Amino acid sequence: MVARRAIGDPAEALKSEASDDNAEVLIELKNVRKSFGKKVVLDGASFKIRRGEAVGIIGSSGTGKSTVLRIMAGLLQPDEGEVIIRGRPRVGLLSDEKDPNLKVGMVFQSAALFDSLTVGENVGFKLYEHSDLPEDVIKGLIQESLAQVGLSGVEDRYPAQLSGGMKKRAALARAIIKEDISENDNPLEEVVMYDEPTAGLDPVASTVVEDLMRNLHTENKAVSSYEEKKGGVASYIVVTHQHSTIRRAVDRLIFLHAGKVVWEGTSKEFDTCEEPIVRQFATGSLQGPIVY
């Protein structure tokens, strides 16, 4: 069944066949609203992100995609509604949480690397600033994280010496770096959030980034039992306009329009969906409910 509901319908969207209803809900938004001045950006958005999912958030420009990503990441507070993290309502921002129950990694559209720092210093920035780990241990974690994204040996370079695609991968390495190496540590699972990760990249560089996102997730899912392998990238969420990312890097889609969730479905259903707003977005037609 195609998961959809009409614009403005208060009923919950039907669940996609891609969803595993038995998987734990890691993040849930309930009737989230957010305005900036008089501009309403989110107008009652509700959806769930479950463990194991690769989710794309799509929709035309200005429909609240990046805003909802930042609210999920705990970087922005909603005006109304609830953000529930593994069954526990979040109060305040991520930085206010004393005992987080889910690690969140954020990869921004611009990569957001500090030009005056080396790649290694960028990747390990949080550890250098906020941990008591020895420098040699941090350097080891930096090398491990860079190796995961295919950037071994670049830690002494500066961002200006990297291509656009390499900068995106360095930003991902920063998002997934381990924060604690204690043998008795019970590492948190992580949800990685990408804000238009392939924007500005050529098709080949885009494919590299898309496959990397998928591979990091797949490697963690390869161990079927949660008890066997704690930590790792449990799920990821991508805000994107790119059809290649929709088809290559995600399994389920959430379509935002006018600050509401108007359709949910699989990436396969996206190509055949007859919902007018989805069809217009998929085909790039000027005719339809999306007005420019």
Residue spans for each PLM region:
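Short coil-to-helix segment of the ABC ATPase nucleotide-binding domain corresponding to the Q-loop/switch region
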Residues: 117-125
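Helix-to-loop junction immediately C-terminal to a conserved catalytic motif
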Residues: 73
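ABC ATPase NBD coupling module
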Residues: 90-105, 135, 272-273
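Conserved ABC ATPase signature
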Residues: 158-162, 166
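Catalytic Walker B motif of ABC-type/P-loop ATPase nucleotide-binding domains
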Residues: 192-195
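The feature captures the beta-strand-to-loop junction immediately N-terminal to the Walker
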Residues: 58-60
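Conserved ABC ATPase "signature" region
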Residues: 135-154
